[in-house]
Amino acid sequence: MSNEARISLVARVAQLPTAQGMAPSANPPISILALAAASYGLRPSEDATVPTGFDPVAVALFEAIVEGAYLVASADGVFDEGERRTFERVVVAACGGQVPQDRIQALVSDLADQLREDGADQRIAAVAKAVSKKEHAQEVLRIAALLAAATNDVSEIERDVLLKLALGCGLEEKDVDLALAEVRKTLQALHGRAPT
């Protein structure tokens, strides 16, 4: 599968609502990621007036979802410029165009700096702190699992980060297995087979 096709597939899966990752009372159903991305896209610059519809809790949740995926993507210690650009493109596509590329680039740059300064365990704790509801924790885990499963088999170190995210967010080990099974099933259904 080409890189473009893989990015498109991952973005489609990320945008799909799930039983756990669906915004309550959304009609039509929308994923929590998509809803949080909409608010993040409205985030004002430091000098601007806060716009109507801006939700700082949703912004923090969006950042936590992206950081959870970033922590898994960089778990092996190798996150070169090519991987970073691909990760940024996946996030932009998964947001359905609601967040501009330059905002995602700035966010990923901040995440890289924070990971370098704080280490993975502190960043996992920061993600967990931003998550206040079980369905939000499940969405953080789902998107992180999606990024891990979409590129290849989930490595032991990626699974370890997924488990730490789950436990930090108040979930259990079985939730990691459920998230991985769900994203693999959805990837297979949308593509005909899971990417290898």
Give names to the regions the model predicted.
Residues 1-71, 78-196:
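Small-residue-enriched hydrophobic alpha-helices in membranes
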